[in-house]
Swiss-Prot record:
PROSITE patterns: HSP70_1, HSP70_2, HSP70_3. Acts as a chaperone. Induction: By stress conditions e.g. heat shock. The keyword NAD does not apply. It comes from the Bacteria. The modification Phosphothreonine is found at T200. InterPro entries: ATPase_NBD (IPR043129), Chaperone_DnaK (IPR012725), Heat_shock_70_CS (IPR018181), HSP70_C_sf (IPR029048), HSP70_peptide-bd_sf (IPR029047), Hsp_70_fam (IPR013126). Keywords: ATP-binding, Chaperone, Nucleotide-binding, Phosphoprotein, Stress response. HAMAP family: DnaK (MF_00332). Belongs to the heat shock protein 70 family. One of its GO terms (molecular function) is ATP binding. This is Chaperone protein DnaK.
Length: 650
């Protein structure tokens, strides 16, 4: 069996490492460096350059040189972060047929995973050249705050590059592995990993525990910003240079793609120099030209000026740290070590801010450029079975949830969630005086429960009679470190509960998982339509219920004509809801119609409420009813309507 390599697929730079025995080896690429720029250039002769060669020619080929593509991976074109980048990047960011953000080079439309695969292919070749044998398996890292689509897109990039991705792991966790296995300190330690890379920021609170001679790494919490990194710091310098040049020369460089590419290189260089020096000079001769001749750029920037330009960006990293500490249930003083990861953490202002927040100096014995790849290689060794003294927590491969009103799959735990994990949600009944509910547990990515795998079902009985929506049933999903799923349901009023145990990880074969992913892609549009239809039906049902209730209480205050109009509209909506072939537009039209004709009913209720002023609770209830009668959507109050069937007792 070949070695499983560890790859840090970064926004700005990438790195590959392997384990040789218990020693880690960060592998030099063909240019002799241990990190490779995540830059890809598409040339006129169809040649593709990756890394340093691509970076060297970027000034003369800006439209076809792609960098920071990781910021687009797994994202929709309409997302505000993508829209922001469109105006900043010299290359074209376009909308794919499926609505994703893609890029264009030489007129060819390229998906971000396709572009990232070129970098992964270079990492694969780097490892193969060193080992002298084929490499087919890898552990690839992603920011801890990446969502499911971003993780899946990264996995797709690996597959396109000819790699079987054995695991997608979080960058801070990988850095913690690299740090933890290198230390001799005994006992449990809580560490904070502050990861400020080229395009993303993460902070994770991780507990390293010694369990019977094994090292267990448990992520207590994570937070971050997937659109904040060194690229944003560079952009601040670029904007400053453009502004100063415009003041001095009256020329706007922001529309000149060749000049922008030179400015980007100069900004990155200046930023690095200011990490060790107090001042740097940016000197770019022949940056542009106008009628009066060529223009040269010469500008001095001090460290203080740079810090002023990026102060708010550094500050933006502190709130996620605060949230991560709170979510982990620890105090800042409980943190034993602070690890810095990512090249941007070399900036003195960043180190100073981290020290100020955590109250201690960050560790300097971790290489911020290589730690993540090293951790990925360690996990690769664990997955291959060659290392037994490390206990890593698994992830659930597909989302887990329950069926709710309208046959919708309501996800409780998303795929790629690190386990053990626990999640609870309060649901309610769908009918008045419903005495029992059935909880159906599903696994899969489809929006409608029927398209997913039913793992099991159980009943919760003995619910006291009450109007629909009043009982509070808390459903809890709990996945332990063994990947075993425990599902419980509890009536919060009576304390009655029922539980089942499901082995989630053994619930599906790899073939089924692959088929589900294919199905989800093929049927995404159809699923979305069904989901929208279910939402409209739920809205219609709720409006029928609240309008009937309001008519019972206030109908005698209406004119005969008004009451008849409401009853006719009510009947019309009920009929369309009974019609299984009715589409979303037909239901929405009837909902809107009932909303309009019941306006008067809402006014009567409001007037009655004003007149009576009979206690805050009664007033609130009437106002809620008025909102329904007026056609407004009922506020959920954190209680999700769920469809549970009555369980008949023999």
């Amino acid at each position: 069996m070949g070695k499983i390599i560890g790859i840090d697929l970064g926004t700005t730079n990438s790195c590959v490492a392997i384990m040789e025995g218990n020693q880690v080896k960060v592998i030099e690429n063909s240019e002799g460096t241990r990190t490779t720029p995540s830059i890809i250039a598409y040339m006129d002769d169809n040649e593709v350059l990756v890394g340093a060669p691509a970076k060297r020619q970027s000034v003369t080929n800006p439209k076809n040189t792609l960098f920071a593509v990781k910021r687009l991976i797994g994202r929709r074109f309409e997302e505000k972060e993508v829209q922001k980048d469109i105006g900043l990047m010299p290359y074209s960011i376009i909308k794919a047929d499926n609505g994703d953000a893609w890029v264009e080079a030489h007129g060819e439309k390229l998906a971000p995973p396709q572009v990232s695969a070129e970098v992964l292919r270079k990492m694969k070749k780097t490892a193969e050249d060193y080992l002298g044998e084929p490499v087919t398996e890898a552990v690839i890292t992603v920011p801890a705050y990446f969502n499911d689509s971003q993780r899946q897109a990264t996995k797709d990039a690996g597959r396109i590059a000819g790699l079987e991705v054995k695991r997608i792991i979080n960058e801070p966790t990988a850095a913690a592995l690299a740090f933890g296995l290198d230390k001799v300190e005994k006992g449990d330690r809580k560490i904070a990993v502050y990861d400020l890379g080229g395009g993303t920021f993460d902070v994770s609170i991780i507990e390293i525990a010694d369990v019977d001679g094994e090292m267990q790494f448990e992520v207590l919490s994570t937070n971050g910003d997937t659109f904040l990194g060194g690229e944003d710091f560079d952009q601040r310098i670029i904007d400053y240079i453009i502004g100063e040049f415009k003041k001095e020369q009256g020329v706007d460089l922001s529309k000149d793609v060749l000049a922008l590419q030179r400015l980007k290189e100069a900004a990155e260089k200046a930023k690095i120099e200011l990490s060790s020096g107090q001042q740097t000079e940016i000197n770019l001769p022949y940056i542009t030209a106008d009628a009066s001749g060529p223009k040269h750029l010469n500008l001095k920037i001090t460290r203080a000026k740079l810090e002023a330009l990026v102060e708010d960006l550094v500050e933006r990293t502190i709130e996620p740290c605060r949230i991560a500490i709170k979510d982990a249930g620890v105090k800042v003083s409980d943190i034993d070590d602070v690890i810095l990861v990512g090249g941007q953490t070399r900036m003195p202002k960043v180190m100073e801010k981290v020290k100020e927040f955590f109250g201690k100096d960050p560790r300097r014995d971790v290489n911020p450029d290589e730690a993540v790849a090293v951790g990925a290689a360690i996990q690769g060794q664990v997955l291959s079975g060659d290392r037994k003294d490390v206990l890593l927590l698994d992830v659930t491969p597909l989302s887990l949830g329950i069926e709710t009103l309208g046959g919708v799959m309501t996800k409780m735990i998303n795929k790629n969630t690190t386990i053990p994990t626990k999640h609870a949600q309060v649901y309610s009944t769908a009918d008045d005086n419903q005495g029992a509910v059935t909880i159906k547990v599903f696994q899969g990515e489809r929006e409608m429960a029927a398209g997913n795998k039913l793992l099991g079902e159980f009943n919760l009985e003995g619910i006291p009679p009450a109007p629909r929506g009043v009982p509070q049933i808390e459903v809890t999903f709990d996945i332990d470190a063994n990947g075993i799923l425990h599902v419980g349901a509890k009536d919060k009023a009576t304390g009655k509960e029922n539980k089942i145990t499901i082995k989630a990880n053994s619930g599906l074969s790899e073939a089924e998982i692959d088929q589900m992913i294919k199905d989800a892609e093929a049927n995404a549009a159809e699923d979305h339509k069904l989901r929208e239809l279910a939402d409209s039906r739920n809205q219609g049902d709720a409006l029928v219920h609240s309008t009937k209730k309001a008519l019972t209480e206030y109908g005698d205050k209406l004119d005969a004509g008004e009451k008849e109009a409401i009853e006719a509209s009510l009947k019309s909506l009920e009929e369309v809801l009974k019609d299984t072939s009715a589409d979303k537009a037909a239901i929405d039209a009837k909902v809107e119609e009932l909303g309009k004709v019941s306006q008067k009913l809402g006014e009567k209720m409001y007037a009655d409420m004003q007149a009576q002023q009979a206690g805050a609770a009664g007033a609130a209830g009437a106002a809620e009813g008025a909102a329904h009668a007026g056609g407004a959507q009922q506020a959920a109050d954190d209680v999700v309507d769920a469809e549970f069937k009555e369980v008949k007792k023999d």
